[in-house]
Every structure is written in C-alpha cells, then in structure tokens.
C-alpha cells in the first residue's frame, strides 16, 4: 500500500466523506436543525422516503474499506504472510499489516453505522460515535509507529498527517459528551477534509513529484515547502467549507421561496397591505381629532353667551 494508489485512494474517500459532512452540517446550521436526528427524515413520507433514511456515510465507509482491503491483499505478489518459516521466525510486511488493520476498522465502523441506523429499532448514537473514535485512536497509534523508519520529506509529510489525526481524535472524544454541538461537527468536518486532501498531496510528493525528480531529504527548503503546502491545504479547505455553506444557504432560500404556493404569497401580501392601510387610517383619524379639539374649546364660550 506504500504507493501512489495506496495514498490517493484513502485521500479521495476522506475528501468525499468530508464534503458530505460539510453539506449535512451546513444544512443543520441554516435550518437550525438537529445533526443526529434531522427533521427531513421524519417529515419525508413520500416515494423517496426510504432513500433518505439510508445510512449514506456508513455505506460509503463499508464500500471504501472493503475495496481498500482487497487492494491491500493484492499488493503483495507472494501473498500477505504473517511470519517467515525460517528459524528463528520473523514477522513479514509490518506496514502492510498496519494498512490492513486501518481498513478493517474503517469497514467495521461503517457496519456499525449501517446497523444502528437501518437495522435496529432505536438508533444508538453513542455506539456509532464510539466506533469512529476507536478507529481514529488506532489510526493514530499505527501512524506513530509507521514513521519510525522515515526521514526527511517523508517524515515531515507524515508528521503533519499525524497532527491532523491527533486533533481529530480530540474532537471526536469531546463529541462523546456533546454529540449535538455544532462547533465540534464543523471542526470535525474541516479536519476530515484536511486529512483527505493532504493524503492526496502526499501521494504526489512521495511517489509522483510534479518536477519528475524525487524530493531531496537533505535540502531544508524542501521541508519548509512541504509545511507551506500543508498551510495552503488548510486555507483551501476552510474556503471550501465557506463556499459549501454559502451555496447551501442560497439553495435553501430559493427552495423555500419556490415551495411557497402563489396563493399563500398573495394572502400574505394582502394581509400585510391591509394591516398597513388600517394603521395609517387610524393615525389620520387620531390626527383629525387632535386638530379639532382646540377649535371646540374656543367655540364653547361663545355658545354659552
């Protein structure tokens, strides 16, 4: 799995997952809706109601994890053996086994989400979040040991990835106690996007550099440029989330206006017009009464005489 496809495939999955999460979070922010129990699931009783209730993110994890497992098993020509038959025996393919462990946990996380949302009578949110947190904890441990024999540019690339995974672990752990906090979901989505885009960038840095020449580990400018690239990814992903929020806000505003019947719009217009006219009429009558009051007070002595 230590090749171009092995890095860009998980990166693509994380980017798509982050974009999906960004749309969900934007919708919840715009409509002031629940993130775990959105209102459209209970209101939608039409023809496509069952489609909306499918655990899309869970199935995405299951399919992506299964494909990555198959790819990892086929990467080793001799077969992914665990130990040699020599004496003393030695462990074989440690990094490949680490990759396989990551993808198995991703698949299990998706299975837990699918079962919780689509099979069980009552959704177990704590179980879903717990499975995700467990996967990220294991991912962090594997990545820390994954870079033991790395140096130079490769070490810097993976160190920045470890930083993102560590922050994601903290956010997901906090969500166990505050699962409906929107701020945590926004940060989580941003970190997923950053991790995915950085994995894709790492595939080009380590295996297919744009210049056609491998990066030199002993050149400090390369290390600095890698960090600069990472900062660019942070800014681009932040702008991407802002763009998704803006587009979602515009779409929901137009969608709501389009769904409002014409009759209701006219009724609202007439009601508002009649109300405004009635208020103006009341003000005019009150002003006439105030103007007539001094005249009546002046004419009253003459009438008495």
From Swiss-Prot:
Name the record gives this protein: Transmembrane epididymal protein 1
Compartments (UniProt record): Membrane
Membrane topology, record value: Multi-pass membrane protein
Main location per the UniProt record: membrane
Residues annotated as transmembrane: 4-24, 51-71, 100-120, 124-144, 159-179, 187-207, 223-243
Keyword vocabulary terms for this entry: Glycoprotein, Membrane, Transmembrane, Transmembrane helix
Family statement: Belongs to the TMEM45 family.
Residues carrying sugar: 32
GO cellular component: membrane
Gene name of this polypeptide: Teddm1
Region (Disordered): 285-305
InterPro entries: DUF716
């Amino acid at each position: 799995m230590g090749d171009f496809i092995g890095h860009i495939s998980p990166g693509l999955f994380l980017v798509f997952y982050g974009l999906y999460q960004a749309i969900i979070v934007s919708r919840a922010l715009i409509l002031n809706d629940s993130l775990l129990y959105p209102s459209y699931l209970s209101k939608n009783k039409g023809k496509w109601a069952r489609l909306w209730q499918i655990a899309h993110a869970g199935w995405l994890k299951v399919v992506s994890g299964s494909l990555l497992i198959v790819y990892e098993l086929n990467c080793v020509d001799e077969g992914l053996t665990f130990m040699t038959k020599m004496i003393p025996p030695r462990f074989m393919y440690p990094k490949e086994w680490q990759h396989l462990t990551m993808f198995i946990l991703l698949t299990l996380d998706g299975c837990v989400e699918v079962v919780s949302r689509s099979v069980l009578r009552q959704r177990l949110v704590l179980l879903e979040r717990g499975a995700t947190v467990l996967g990220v904890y294991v991912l962090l441990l594997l990545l820390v040991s994954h870079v033991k024999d790395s140096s130079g540019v490769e070490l810097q690339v993976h160190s920045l990835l470890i930083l993102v995974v560590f922050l994601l672990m903290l956010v997901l752990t906090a969500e166990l106690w505050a699962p409906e906090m929107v701020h945590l979901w926004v940060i989580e989505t941003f970190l997923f996007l950053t991790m995915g885009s950085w994995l894709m960038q790492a595939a080009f840095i380590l295996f297919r550099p744009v210049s056609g020449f491998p990066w030199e580990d002993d050149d400090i400018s390369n290390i600095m440029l890698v960090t600069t690239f990472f900062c660019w990814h942070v800014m681009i992903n932040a702008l991407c989330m802002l763009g998704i929020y803006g587009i979602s806000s515009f779409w929901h505003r137009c969608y709501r206006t389009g769904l409002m019947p014409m009759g209701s719009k006219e009724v609202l217009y007439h009601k508002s017009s009649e109300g405004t006219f009635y208020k103006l009429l009341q003000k005019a009558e009150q002003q006439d009464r105030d103007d007539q009051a001094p005249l009546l007070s002046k004419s009253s002595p003459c009438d008495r005489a």
